[in-house]
Amino acid sequence: MAIFEERPHGYTERAESFGLNLKMPQQKGKLELLYLRPLDLSVDETMQEILDAIERVGAKRLVIDSLVGFEMALAPGFRADFRESLYRMISALTGAGITILSTVEVEDTFDAMPFSHYAISFLTDDIIRMRYVEIDGQLRKVMVVIKMRGGNHSKDIREYVITDKGVVVIGPRSTDYEGLTTGIPKRTGPRTAQGEEAAPEPKAKP
């Protein structure tokens, strides 16, 4: 796991609060948290660090958290051609049989929905979009599968919560709103009567 925005100890502790135990696989030599932010490397040097870690643990999966942090961790002279360098790195890793999961923080307004400012969706097989939306005066979280190369997938926009047991997707998709992907949806279903308290936020099942 290549991380760029948080030190391994803090990353491990925060993951544990979400019900994800990273300590045990690290102790067993099955997982390595590779903190590359302070090294100021080129893309080729970064890839070599990652390949060395993959070889040490015999990994078949790599998490890059995040691409924004990855770019900022590079020496300034290598940021201009980040997209091309990233393409070479991903091609080399997938060619070696490594499955890659990467996160991208997207800064946008509520009325926009870009996938990423890197325009690298062509590199990916699958894209899951997660964002906040405003519903009844509350910020809630929704997710939607944007792309699944080579297969069909659900088109539903689903609400989710993050608990101490991990990510929990809530109930059936909502049909009471449209425009959820804008972050400011419009209600299409029945409203609560004036003066009535709005329905509480759905709770995750234990």
Region locations from a protein language model:
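A short beta-strand-to-loop transition that corresponds to the Sensor-1 phosphate-sensing loop
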Residues: 5-6, 103-106, 149
